[in-house]
Structure formats: C-alpha cells, structure tokens
C-alpha cells in the first residue's frame, strides 16, 4: 500500500531522518522529518497553472505547532489551536526567506508549504528541522525549485562554535544564529548575539554553512529515489521586449533616478512608464503584450538601470556615495506625560517610539510547547499605510510587522538590565510615521533612545543600519543605509544592529550565488562604520539611562521575606494582601522565592505597603521603641497593639514614672502611645513599658536610671 523511502544520517550527535511515501500522499510533496525525537510533517502543493492576470509569485508558508506534540491540551475556552502564535509567524518567515529566491523568475503558480510540528522532545527546537523538511518536500514535489536548501543553528559557548545546540545549552550561549543556504551559497541568516565582533559572526555563518552540507546530501539522496518528475516550466523570454523598451526609456529613466526627492522621482518614473505603455499599447491596434508583462519588464529595467548607475558612478539614487548615511535627527522626551519617548528621523524614514514601564502584573504569559514562561520585554512595531503615502488596511499586525518588531527586540534585549537591577516590565511601541528604507533599524535606534529617556539603565546604546550589496561579475558595491528603492534591487540585503563594542543582531538575505566570505567581510566592516556613525548622532540626544524615572512612571521597591512567611502576607483566601492593596493603593507582586515587588507612582504608598508587610513578617526587637494603640485596659495595665498585628501588655507599674492607682487615669482605649519592648516573660508574652519613653516625642528617656531599673525589675 505504501511506497516508503527514507534516508537517515547522524547530524551533530543526533539522528536526522527524512521519510516520504506514507503520509500525505495526495500533496505534491510530503516529508516526515525527525531530529532526536522531535518530528515535523512538511507538505507542498502547487497549482498546475497560474491564475489569469497573476503578476507575482503567490507563495505561502504556514508553520504550525500542535500542543499534542508536547503532551498538552490548549488553554482557553475552546481547547483547540487558534490564530498563529508569534513563534509560528516568525518560523513561517524563517522558512519562506531561503526558499523564495530559489523559484524560477516568472513562476506564478499558487504554492503553499505547510509544516506541522507533531512531536516535540523538548530538546531540539523544531524550527531548523522544519526548514530542512520544507526544503526536502519541495525537492521531491516536482515543482520548479532550484534547491535543496539546508539549515542549521549555531551557538557560541566558551569561545567555541556549537552546531545545533540543545535547548538547555542555549542558556549558556552568547549567540543564537540560524543560517540556511544551498551547497554553494548562504541564503539567509537570523541571529541574536551578546556584543560579538564581525569576525565571530561571520565565522558562525560559515561554520553553519559547512555544518548543514550533510543535510543537503541526504535530501539529494532521497530525491534520487523518490522525487516526482519535474513539471514542465519554461520561463518566458522577454529579452527582445526589454531591449526595445531600453531603447525607448533608458535615457529618461536614468535622468529620473538622478532626482533625489522620493516623491518627485516617483512622478518622473511614472511619466516614463506612461510613455512606455503608450508605445506598446497604441490606440486602435491589437497590443502585442499584456499589461502585466509590460509592468514586469519595466520593473526589471528599473532595477538594471539603478544597478548600472551605482556600479558605474559609485553614486546613489539620492546623490549619496556608497558609504554615507542619511542625515539623522534624534530627539527624546517628545511626549512628556509618557514614561519615555523618542523621535528618530533618518532621511525620509522616521519613527515615534514610546516606552512604558510596568510591574510584574504586566508581564506577558507565553504558552509555548516547552512550557509557560513570562516575558518582561515587549516590543511592538506598527507600519501604517500613511508612512509611505498610501491608503491601506489597518488592524492586527501582519507577518512583516511581527518580524520587524522581533528583529528590533533581538537587537535591544542583550543590553537590558537584569530583573534584579531594574524590576520593571518594559513595553516599547514603534510607530513608523515615514518610511523610505529600513524602518526596522530606525525602530532599534528609537527604542534605545526611548528606553534611556525612561530611565532604563541599558548597558550601552544600540543602533542599527540596513545595508545592500550589488554584484555584477567581478564588480561589487556595498551600500550603507539603503533607501526603499534600493531595498529590492540588491543581491544581498542585510541589517546589523549593535553597540560600539559589537553586534547584537544580524539579519541577512542573499539572493544569488557568488557572494564570497571576503565580500561579506567587506560588507560587515562597512556596516560597522555606519553603525558607529549612527551611535554618534544618537549621542547628541542622550547617552545613558536617566538617573531618575519620569514623573508619571511607577516606582517599584523590592523586598525579600522568608518563604515560610508568604502565607501570612497573603492571608486566608488572599484577605491580607487585598487589604494592603486597598488601603495603601500600591500594586504588590509576590514571587514563590519570597521576592516582593511593591509598585506605585507615589512613594508614600510604597512606603506604607512596605511597612505593613514588614510588620507582618518581621519580629519586634528588644530595646526598640514602637508606636502603638491602646486596644484594651484592665486593672493590672493596658494592652497595646504595636508593630502591625502584635499585642503586648504595659503593666500598670510601667504606665508612668509616678505611681498609678488606676489604668484609666493614664490611658484609654484608642490612645496612641509610645512603648519600649522590654522583653518576654517565661510564657513568651511581650513586656512593654511606657514610662521609659517620652510620650510627647517618642524618644527614650535617657539618664532616668530609677525608671530603667524599675522597668527591668518588673
């Protein structure tokens, strides 16, 4: 019934198995992949023909995690998986980026890749395995795909590169880098690092590239016995059309791309495009080409002309040379009622970034396959259509917004203070108000500024820069701080973020073979210069976290109590802690280890709550004077409530220096009095004295030896 083929290799100390022919046989390609005991199913389906009028390649990648894979039942009312989680969205993008460039130009058939995690061993992250499985499924499917692609994770532990570290090993690693590519070229890099230099980062990329070669060999071996017949696909040859269009439009298009202002340049390009269309769609005649073909060839021609201009003249669309970064303006404190804010403008790219400080209650609970955890740093990136002068959909964030936000998050996170040093939950929102290239890196810069404005003690400021690279034969040009128009015409786009000392995040997308390690080294060195220049410009606004929090930010005080006292602070059914919160107005968060965080915008509220908790858990000290309230009087003395909920007896002989005939002559119920703790009797009862304390000032009476002696004798 089944025609099963499989291949198995040992990879980084664990078995990797790829199997096809048993599951999902109606898909064009399906591979069941396992690594260790983590298992994913990857499927590929591609339509037999493109939709009429389709002018782009509709590739969709869906990565999904099933909770049963880790022996869990989903939370929530419906108890089933719902909308994609942040990780599912990010891994979908991670798979998409290296495979998309390997489909032939002109292939426009609707194509869907679905990768499902069906078992998780809690040791091997399924993201890299999913990339491998998707690549294998595409290679077997018969769909035109110039793969296969391999992928690997690289850690850096104790100065050594580690291939595919286990999840628990990642806690020790100062690098989390995922790299994907073919036998000949690196195609994609995604990473987070703790201030590593360019050589270490590039070394990790090349180490990973070498590390996944056995995987590519295994996919090829499987394809030799299990691949379907390749589909016939002959890309349309538009070279004659392009040559004709070039003769009509080259001069005017070159002139248009000398205009430095974006809006004026677009107007000029549109005029050239209109002229081209008028030529190929004459009135009264049957057009030779479709509107989609003319548009695609014109777009290709635009890219060619810009590339030629840059390589020939070393001058960019906006008049800059290859290394110059656009003019930068950094401002902080632009929204004084927020906790921290910044406006970062670089050329025609601009971001308003706002930081908000919260308490432990504001941490985000993340329910992942590996277990529930709390996230104290949140970064949300918004890209409204007006930022590029367009209308469009507004609503929940798309994949791009989630991906850009996570890139900036990775760049900033290594520089954040520890929870012990700064016990706040941090939320940053980046509103892109203008965009002409690299809004994600503007978010990195703006986030660094806004956090410092909020008083967050970042280890160092962080800046980011987007780079491009153009390669034609032996000639290449590296572009610093690329424009939106330069974003798609390059052969390598990469974004680097970090401090003066090193890189905290690196993202690369390489579209062609031939970009060598040496070329990447040159590109990273140029990016380092650009990053340091941007950091210098940011320093004009702020260089470190403010010493004081903003006026409207909450204050948090941390105290620690014995674990066995937690129940007393919480009280039966939470009665005590609720009363403290209601009476003081402070927010209180109690951890299992006895750490208590008290938060409020008012210092008085924090102090009141702290004293209350202290009075519950602390023991009164002999010889210390306390303020108390008389709660009951008797013939033999008065009972005084002091030190929170403690009660003690002031014997009638200790009420005053002079002899007292009747307790009520000195105190009445409800009176505020000062008492000194003299000790405990043989039954452990508290002994208090009023006569050794000045009741007007609350200070102990010094030098009254008789009073002291009398008190001690009682």
Curated annotation (Swiss-Prot):
Organism: Allorhizobium ampelinum (strain ATCC BAA-846 / DSM 112012 / S4) (Agrobacterium vitis (strain S4))
GO molecular function, one term: RNA binding
Task performed by this protein: Involved in mRNA degradation. Catalyzes the phosphorolysis of single-stranded polyribonucleotides processively in the 3'- to 5'-direction.
NCBIfam families attached to this UniProt entry: polynuc_phos, PRK11824.1
Co-factor(s): Mg(2+)
Xref: SUPFAM superfamilies: Eukaryotic type KH-domain (KH-domain type I), Nucleic acid-binding proteins, Ribonuclease PH domain 2-like, Ribosomal protein S5 domain 2-like
Domain S1 motif: 623-691
PROSITE patterns for this protein: KH_TYPE_1, S1
Protein name: Polyribonucleotide nucleotidyltransferase
Any one of the GO BP annotations: RNA processing
Catalytic reactions of this protein: RNA(n+1) + phosphate = RNA(n) + a ribonucleoside 5'-diphosphate
Family: Belongs to the polyribonucleotide nucleotidyltransferase family.
Binding site for Mg(2+): 487, 493
Gene Ontology CC terms, in alphabetical order: cytosol
Enzyme class: transferase
EC number from the UniProt entry: 2.7.7.8
Gene3D superfamilies in the cross-refs: GHMP Kinase, N-terminal domain, K Homology domain, type 1, Nucleic acid-binding proteins
Keyword Mitochondrion: no
Record keywords, A-Z: Cytoplasm, Magnesium, Metal-binding, Nucleotidyltransferase, RNA-binding, Transferase
Localisation: Cytoplasm
Domain KH: 554-613
């Amino acid at each position: 019934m089944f025609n099963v083929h499989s291949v198995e290799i040992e990879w980084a100390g664990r078995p990797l198995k790829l199997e096809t022919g048993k599951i999902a046989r109606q898909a064009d390609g399906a591979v069941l992949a396992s690594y260790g005991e983590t298992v994913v199913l990857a499927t590929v389906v591609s339509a037999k023909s493109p939709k009429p009028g389709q002018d782009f390649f509709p590739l969709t990648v869906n990565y999904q995690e099933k909770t049963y894979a880790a022996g869990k039942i989903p939370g929530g009312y419906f108890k089933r998986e719902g909308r994609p989680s942040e990780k599912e969205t990010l891994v979908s993008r991670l798979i998409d980026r290296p495979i998309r460039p390997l489909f032939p130009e002109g292939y426009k058939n609707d194509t869907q890749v679905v990768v499902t995690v069906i078992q998780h061993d809690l040791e091997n992250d399924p993201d890299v395995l999913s990339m491998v499985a998707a690549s294998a499924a595409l290679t077997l499917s018969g769909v035109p795909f110039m793969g296969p692609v391999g992928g690997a994770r690289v850690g850096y532990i104790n100065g050594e590169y580690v291939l595919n570290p286990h999840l628990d090993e990642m806690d020790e690693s100062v690098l989390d880098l995922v790299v994907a590519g073919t036998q000949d070229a690196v195609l994609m890099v995604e990473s987070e690092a703790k201030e590593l230099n360019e050589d270490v980062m590039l070394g990790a990329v090349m180490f990973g590239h070498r590390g996944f070669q056995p995987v590519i060999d295994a996919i090829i071996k499987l394809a030799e016995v299990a691949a379907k017949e390749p589909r016939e696909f002959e890309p349309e040859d538009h070279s004659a059309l392009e040559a004709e269009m070039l003769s009509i439009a080259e001069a005017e298009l070159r002139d248009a791309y000398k205009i430095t202002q974006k809006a004026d340049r677009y107007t000029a390009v549109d005029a050239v495009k209109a002229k081209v269309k008028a030529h190929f769609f004459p009135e009264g005649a049957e057009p030779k080409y479709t509107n989609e073909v003319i548009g695609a060839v014109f777009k290709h021609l635009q890219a060619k002309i810009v590339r030629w201009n840059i390589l020939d003249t070393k001058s960019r669309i906006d008049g800059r040379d290859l290394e110059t970064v656009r003019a930068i303006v950094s401002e902080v404190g632009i929204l004084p009622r927020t906790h921290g804010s910044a406006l970062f403008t670089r050329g025609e790219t601009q971001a308003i970034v706002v930081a908000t400080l919260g308490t432990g209650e504001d941490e985000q609970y993340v329910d992942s396959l590996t277990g529930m955890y709390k996230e104290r740093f949140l970064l949300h990136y918004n890209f409204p259509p007006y930022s590029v002068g367009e209308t469009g959909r507004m609503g929940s964030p798309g994949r791009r917004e989630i991906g850009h936000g996570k890139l900036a998050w990775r760049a900033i996170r290594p520089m954040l203070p520890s929870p012990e040093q700064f016990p706040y939950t941090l939320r940053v929102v980046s509103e892109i108000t203008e965009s002409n290239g690299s809004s994600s890196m503007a978010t990195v810069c703006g986030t660094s500024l806004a956090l410092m404005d909020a008083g967050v003690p970042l280890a160092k400021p962080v800046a980011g820069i987007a780079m491009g690279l153009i390669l034609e034969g032996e000639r290449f040009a590296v572009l610093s701080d690329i424009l939106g128009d330069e974003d798609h015409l390059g052969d390598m786009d990469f974004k680097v973020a970090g401090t003066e000392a090193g890189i905290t995040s690196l993202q690369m997308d390489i579209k062609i073979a031939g970009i060598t390690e040496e070329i990447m080294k040159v590109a990273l060195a140029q990016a380092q210069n650009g990053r340091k220049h941007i950091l210098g410009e940011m320093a004009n606004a702020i260089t470190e976290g403010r010493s004081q929090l903003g006026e409207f930010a909450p204050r948090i005080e941390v105290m620690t109590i014995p674990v066995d006292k937690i129940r007393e602070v919480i009280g039966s059914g939470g009665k005590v802690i609720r009363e403290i919160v209601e009476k003081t107005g402070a927010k209180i968060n109690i951890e299992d280890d006895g750490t208590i965080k008290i938060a409020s915008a008012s210092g008085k509220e924090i102090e009141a709550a702290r004293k209350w908790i202290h009075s519950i858990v602390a023991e009164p000290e002999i010889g210390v004077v306390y303020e108390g309230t008389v709660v009951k009087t008797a013939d033999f003395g008065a009972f005084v409530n002091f030190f929170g909920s403690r009660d003690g007896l002031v014997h009638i002989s200790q009420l005053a220096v002079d002899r007292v005939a009747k307790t009520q002559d000195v105190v009445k119920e409800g009176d505020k009095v000062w008492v000194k703790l003299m000790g405990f009797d043989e039954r452990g009862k508290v002994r208090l004295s009023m006569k050794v304390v000045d009741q007007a000032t609350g200070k102990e009476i010094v030098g009254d030896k008789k009073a002291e002696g009398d008190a001690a004798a009682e």
